[in-house]
Amino acid sequence: TTACCNFCPCTRSIPPQCRCTDIGETCHSACKTCLCTKSIPPQCHCADITNFCYPKCN
């Protein structure tokens, strides 16, 4: 999947610290730290902290 994120809160610091809080069955392709529950289907979110947000998903 292309890296995209609908919910991406950022801190007001410079540089900002942003985290994608979308939850889905997988994480986006650029995610380095993907955390998933053991449920079926799994609920995964990306734990990476970046200084930007990816474009919104369609």
Curated annotation (Swiss-Prot):
Keyword Disulfide bond listed: yes
InterPro entries: Bowman-Birk_prot_inh, Prot_inh_BBI
Swiss-Prot/TrEMBL site (Reactive bond for trypsin) positions: 12-13, 38-39
GO cellular component, one term: extracellular region
Inducing or repressing factors: By wounding.
Membership in a protein family: Belongs to the Bowman-Birk serine protease inhibitor family.
Protein name: Bowman-Birk type wound-induced trypsin inhibitor
GO MF annotation list: serine-type endopeptidase inhibitor activity
Organism of this sequence: Medicago sativa
Keyword Hydrolase included in the entry's annotation: no
Disulfide pattern: 4-57, 5-20, 8-53, 10-18, 27-34, 31-46, 36-44
Keywords annotated in UniProt: Disulfide bond, Protease inhibitor, Serine protease inhibitor
Highest rank taxon of the organism: Eukaryota
PROSITE patterns in the cross-refs: BOWMAN_BIRK
Gene3D superfamilies in UniProt: Cysteine Protease (Bromelain) Inhibitor, subunit H
Entry-linked Pfam families: Bowman-Birk_leg
Taxonomic lineage: Eukaryota, Viridiplantae, Streptophyta, Embryophyta, Tracheophyta
